[in-house]
């Protein structure tokens, strides 16, 4: 996900995307601890997506 895809969205859409990504991050961390995660790099990608969404939310303020 790129910032250019995010910056045109509304605050409500960004809030729902942020919630979804945080839930995804939680499940990925759980899978990592139970040795079910095949690609650990997914965690860092989701963290970066969360940071991009937060940046877009702060830009709207």
Curated annotation (Swiss-Prot):
Q: Listed GO cellular component terms?
A: ribonucleoprotein complex; ribosome
Keyword set for this entry?
A: Ribonucleoprotein, Ribosomal protein
GO molecular-function terms, A-Z: structural constituent of ribosome
A GO BP term, please?
translation
In terms of Pfam families, this protein maps to: Ribosomal_L29
Is Glycosyltransferase included in the keywords of this UniProt record? no
Family statement = Belongs to the universal ribosomal protein uL29 family.
Query: What is the recorded name of this protein?
Result: Large ribosomal subunit protein uL29
Q: Which organism is it from?
A: Campylobacter jejuni subsp. jejuni serotype O:2 (strain ATCC 700819 / NCTC 11168)
What are the top taxonomic ranks of the organism? Bacteria, Pseudomonadati, Campylobacterota, Epsilonproteobacteria, Campylobacterales
